[in-house]
From Swiss-Prot:
Pfam families: Oxidored_q2. The gene is ND4L. InterPro entries: NUOK/Mnh_C1-like (IPR039428). This is NADH-ubiquinone oxidoreductase chain 4L. It comes from Mytilus edulis (Blue mussel). It comes from the Eukaryota. Belongs to the complex I subunit 4L family. It catalyses: a ubiquinone + NADH + 5 H(+)(in) = a ubiquinol + NAD(+) + 4 H(+)(out). It is found in: Mitochondrion membrane. The chain crosses the membrane at residues 1-21, 29-49, 54-74. Its EC number is 7.1.1.2. Keywords: Electron transport, Membrane, Mitochondrion, NAD, Respiratory chain, Translocase, Transmembrane, Transmembrane helix, Transport, Ubiquinone. Core subunit of the mitochondrial membrane respiratory chain NADH dehydrogenase (Complex I) that is believed to belong to the minimal assembly required for catalysis. Complex I functions in the transfer of electrons from NADH to the respiratory chain. The immediate electron acceptor for the enzyme is believed to be ubiquinone. Gene3D superfamilies: 1.10.287.3510. Its main location: mitochondrion.
Length: 93
């Protein structure tokens, strides 16, 4: 069980690193969010082993977040032509 705690904390910290350091592309931000939600799932599994419904709820929320991120990525790609954060922040003039 100790390795699952370590893996959860490692995934959450790697997700934070990806979000704060590799934020040039929108896809990198979404991958960082997914890593953080996977780390949260591991940590929740360690601390709440008897509460299987809560683990399923967190997993369901992570899947919903991933589908919303994918829809946003497709929408941004259609509107701007790329997934660079600089193209989202420019005013277009």
């Amino acid at each position: 069980m100790v390795w699952m705690k370590f893996l959860g904390v490692l995934l959450m910290s790697m997700g934070c690193f990806v979000i704060f350091r590799m934020n040039k592309h929108l896809l990198c931000l979404f991958v960082g969010l997914e890593m953080m939600s996977l780390g949260l799932l591991f940590v929740t599994h360690v601390f709440l082993m008897n509460q299987f419904w809560l683990i399923l709820l967190i997993l369901c929320l992570a899947v919903c977040e991933a589908s919303i991120c994918l829809a946003l990525l497709v929408m941004v790609m259609r509107l701007c032509g790329d997934d660079l954060m600089s193209s989202l922040l420019s005013d277009g003039s």
